[in-house]
Amino acid sequence: MGAVIVHASAASLSLPDGEQWLAHAKQGLAPYWMMPSARGEPEGNFPTFRCDDGQLLDVKRVCAELNYGWITPHFGREYTRMKSRQTYAYGVLFHLTGDPEALKLARQGAKYLIEELQDKEHGGFISFTQEGKAGLEWQQRTSQDQAYALVGLAMLYYLTRDAQIESVLIQQQRFIFDKYRLPDGKGLAWVLEDGDEQSAKQRELVAQLDQINGYLLLVAPLLPEPHKSRWLEELNWLTHVMLSHYYSAEEQRFYGAIHHKAVMMQSAKHNDFGHTIKAYWITYLSGQKLGNAAWQTLARQGMQHTLQQAQYAPNWADIAPWVPPALQAKWKGQQVLSWRSRPGNNGISSWEWAELDQAAMTLALLDGNVPKVLYYTLPSYMQIWVDPRFGGVGLNPQSTKAFHWGNAYHQFEHALVGYLFSQQMSKKPVTLYYAMDKAQAEHLAPYYFNADVQQVESLLNAAGLPRIKVQFTSLKP
């Protein structure tokens, strides 16, 4: 890779280094997710709703950060997808730090998902439980929920190569693609029957996209044959579906849904920069895994365009109250750059911010050119979005951290990609932890990226599993 190009105007600024990313994960994010209240009863049954201070939701005295009209109707439901996303986060925390407690929690989360939340009668996973009972008829569960039930299991399989988890992943992937595949071949259905305000007529981007980032992309290269080849074929098909039916070359964006003209408008649900950048990122990574150079080129150009559209310079007076003194001293008098959700809408949620950062970091790894925006958005994520008192990142800066759509998933993926990015840009080795022995240490790669394995070191067992510490060099997306 060529020399790192730093914009002259960013010369006085600095990017977080690898140690800062590890500190961010351990001291910025982990405190909120390692609290006793986060661990569930029994441990592994991670609660969907928690207040900003970590307390469990009390429906008789609802904390302000959860007291929104779009959240309160879901109280009483415990969502499988959120338990799986939290399992993923503990897996990443172990991956970055080797923390045995994080590994134990990831294993407990996986155990609960497998033993308690699979639909033993109909197949697939239960979307949510209410008063201990499964919600919805099986045909009313979304294919997105079926995918996100696997995101934590996929991460733990990547870390452990556990045979039971492998079996569940293979079985669930087959269930989703057998049951939800549309007769016209244009992807996967959203739901099979109307219910819970969802319609079988819906054609949703995330029904396709979240199969890929939920499990296909991470797990497919690791599976034994014939499963590996079949999963890679499905990865190829779904990426093709996204580009053929959900992508507009003219508008250079992905449609959030395609079942009606109204749902394809830029102002409609899921037609934001977050979903488009994520779809481009996944298209690039799929193209890389499958050796499809045309997809990689399209995705790189699309990411570049979207990142330009998504950045803007906010008024200093609007952001100054949020900026901590250390950053104020660095940024005063400069044109600070930020991310936004849509054209003409400068609001943004933390998950969209994370996705935009991850795409920008990936492009920087590819061409050695760090865009100026990252010199602002990475420190902002660490120092403005993170709650300095209780830890964790919310939908809003420092608030609304655990609800039916938001928890630890995006913030920990962001920390992992950030660490990989900073180590490679500094030409330092990447150190990651896995829960397997040296004999199993095949097909090791740092998350979605490629790298050379420099060293594999055996460590003491943790949480009943062997551990290895792996050093990678020459990381490339």
Which stretches of residues belong to each language-model region?
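Glycan-recognition and catalytic cores of secretory/periplasmic carbohydrate-active enzymes
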Residues: 5-477
